[in-house]
Design a protein with these regions (language model features):
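Membrane-water interface at loop-to-transmembrane-helix junctions
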Residues: 163-170, 243-266
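A broadly tuned "polar low-complexity/structure-edge" signature
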Residues: 2, 17-20, 102, 231, ...
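N-terminal secretory/membrane targeting signals
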Residues: 2-29
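Transmembrane-helix bundle segments that line or gate the permeation/cavity pathway
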Residues: 18, 26-244
Length: 267
């Protein structure tokens, strides 16, 4: 039997829905971002994806407990070079290059095909870096432009506020979602002037965040591109002075939580 409270609640829900429907208005839409052209035959993509999924399922079915851990153990290497001073210089070079690209975006040609900023951002950085970071070496830690300026301007800076570790990388999830929204919903993400303003604003946000919460904490938990390339680097076979099969770092580093999973889904 329906009670008077249940009937009143149903009426309230339908009343709210009706008010929302009556208050709707037409909205503007656009064609979103351009599609990616598959240069290889489509059959190659389909076959590669099918084989990958099939092998993954077979591995999960027939692999004995602990067998994967034994196979994925890395082999220690006998050398480990200290490259910290050289990395500081390379990051400073990366910051200088980013500043020049932003200047080119603001003052250069308005045609995205003729301006260097969109070409470098969307072709070199957003595509080529993924391959290098995942297969060859940790390129992002060498050219990351964000810590370089902060290190130069505030070499002896003290943290103003502590970023709680329990937040994990949820702040980076929010920033990555905002970035993906810019790429997908903006009417002209390739426009040099618009892209330069976005890059400059994000650089200022990152510099301010590192000033308040500290360089290491901000880059590890909030700066979405540092988090992105750190996760991609977990696929790489080599790390520091160890070498193993692709993915061994994922088994060694078990500090990932739900925020990391959501971050990967957003990508």
């Amino acid at each position: 039997m329906y009670t008077n409270k249940m009937i009143s609640f149903v009426k309230l829900v339908f009343g709210v829905l009706g008010a929302i429907m009556l208050g709707t208005t037409p909205v503007w839409a656009h064609a979103a971002n351009q599609g990616f052209v598959l240069l290889l035959p489509t059959t190659a993509y389909i076959a590669g994806g099918t084989v990958t999924v099939a092998l993954t399922i077979l591995l999960l079915i027939f692999a004995k407990p602990g067998a994967i851990d034994a196979v994925m153990q890395p082999v220690p290497l006998r050398f480990r070079a200290s490259t910290l001073p050289l990395r500081d210089w390379s990051q400073s070079t990366g910051a200088l290059c980013l500043a020049l690209l932003i200047l080119i975006g603001l003052r250069g040609p308005t045609d995205p095909q003729a301006n260097l900023l969109p070409l470098v951002i969307w072709t070199v950085w957003w595509m080529l870096f993924f391959v290098v970071q995942a297969l060859i070496f940790d390129l992002w830690s060498w050219i990351n432009p964000f810590p370089a300026v902060h290190r130069i301007l505030m070499s002896e800076h003290r943290v103003i506020l502590n970023l709680p570790s329990r937040l994990s990388i949820w702040p980076a999830v929010v920033l990555m979602a905002a970035f993906q929204g810019f790429v997908l919903a903006d009417t002209a993400p390739n426009d040099p002037d618009r892209l330069a303003v976005f890059a400059l604003g994000y650089w200022a946000l990152t510099l301010g965040g590192m000033t308040v919460f500290g360089r290491e904490a901000w880059l590890k938990q909030v700066e979405c591109f540092s988090v992105l390339f750190a996760l991609i680097g977990l696929i790489r076979m080599g790390r520091s002075n160890r070498l193993g099969l692709p993915g061994w770092q994922l088994l060694q580093d078990r500090d990932h939580d739900l925020s990391h999973a959501i971050f990967v889904v957003i990508i």
